[in-house]
Amino acid sequence: VVSAILRGLDAGALRTMCDRFRDARPNMVVILISAQEDKANIAVSVGKEAQAKGLNAGKIVREVAQVAGGKGGGKPDFAMAGTKDVTKLDDALEAADGIVGNMLAD
């Protein structure tokens, strides 16, 4: 799992970064959060090998976004969410590893 909070990137830039990581490492889960003033975007990308292990970007992004008071969804390989509570981004990122770990354990 690669995860980071970035500043000032729009949703398109987040998607591009996630796609590049996913294409380079099919066993990887990438969770990127970009804060912009009073809102944030959360992007999750899951490579093919990671999907084969039961991981789903749509499910991951929903759970991560809930920690930050946001909502989102998407496909098994890529999903996005948004939140207006930028004060909880660190909590969301910290929860991400546990969320992925729980999905692998199921």
Regions found by a protein language model. Give the residues of each.
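Glycine-rich, acidic loop segments that terminate in or are immediately followed by a histidine
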Residues: V2-D106
